[in-house]
Structure formats: C-alpha cells, structure tokens
C-alpha cells in the first residue's frame, strides 16, 4: 500500500493528499531528492496501522532486495506523540545503503541514521545505537564482517554518542 514518491503517475494520483504533500515538502526541504547517496525511491503509506503518514526509507540488502525499512514522522501533530523513527515490525535491522557501497573506494563511512548517509558517497547507516552499547543486530554484524570486511571504516555518530563512542 506504499506510494512510491519517485513515480510521477502515483504522485499525480495522490496530488490532493495533504500527507503526500507534507512528505514531499520534507524531502525537498532536507534535499533528500538530490542527495548523492539517496536510495532509488522513498515511500509513504496512507493506511498502514504502524507506519501511516510517515516517510518510508527502504533498506536494500546486498542483492538489491528490501530487507528492512525505517519510517520517520512527518506531520507536526505526530512529532510530540509518536516516535521520530520506527523500524519494520518484527524484523532484524540491516545496514542502510549496503547495496550502494562501491569497491571503487577503500573506505566506507558508517553513520547512525540513514538520512545522514544520504549525503556521503560509500556510506551506510546502522539505524540507531542503543544506550547499552550494543549497537548491531546479528544481521548487521554479518554484513560488517562479510560485505564490508575489507573496507577501512570511518564511524560518524550523532553528537549524543561522542563521549561514549570509545567505549563501544
């Protein structure tokens, strides 16, 4: 039931939707549509019970299959009552943008959030770091130890983790 925000026919069909308009505004305002490392498409759902009215960011795996997704609040009324980010229910997190890592580069940049990774070539994101220092799911560990094994890794964490980064 997701609307592909890169598909002009779908955008035309939903042109009167205030939610689609709000999501498109966020994409333009944050320059997500012109980012160097953006995914092929972004989505929005108008009906999903959990992810309704949220920007949907797909996580493609090494085989170009959507294995996970994260959603972000868009509407002002939701900012104070709903979590800013939610992941796919009952699914193990994967690395965002691992499908876009290129062997033309020696280094891969690892961000906390996927939107940060939109703006740097050869970057991935872990989609959140826990307070207890357990940062990765088993699947993410697997991706780090196989697909990204031979890359130099540069970690770029959000500021709340600066003092704790050396402890992880």
PLM regions: where:
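TOPRIM metal-binding catalytic domain and adjacent DNA-binding surface shared by DnaG-type primases
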Residues: 1-56, 60-63, 102-103
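Residue-level preference for nonpolar/small residues embedded in alpha-helices
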Residues: 18-19, 112, 164
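A sequence-composition feature that detects small, non-aromatic residues
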Residues: 22, 35, 41, 91, ...
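Phosphate-handling DNA/RNA-contact segment within nucleic-acid enzymes
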Residues: 26, 48-151
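Compositionally biased non-globular segments, especially hydrophobic aliphatic-rich helices
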Residues: 44, 123, 128-130, 162, ...
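Acidic, metal-coordinating catalytic cores used for nucleic-acid/nucleotide bond scission
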Residues: 133-137, 157-167
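Intrinsically disordered, low-complexity Ser/Thr/Pro-rich tracts
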Residues: 144, 167-168
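Short beta-strand-alpha-helix junction that forms the catalytic/metal-binding core
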Residues: 154
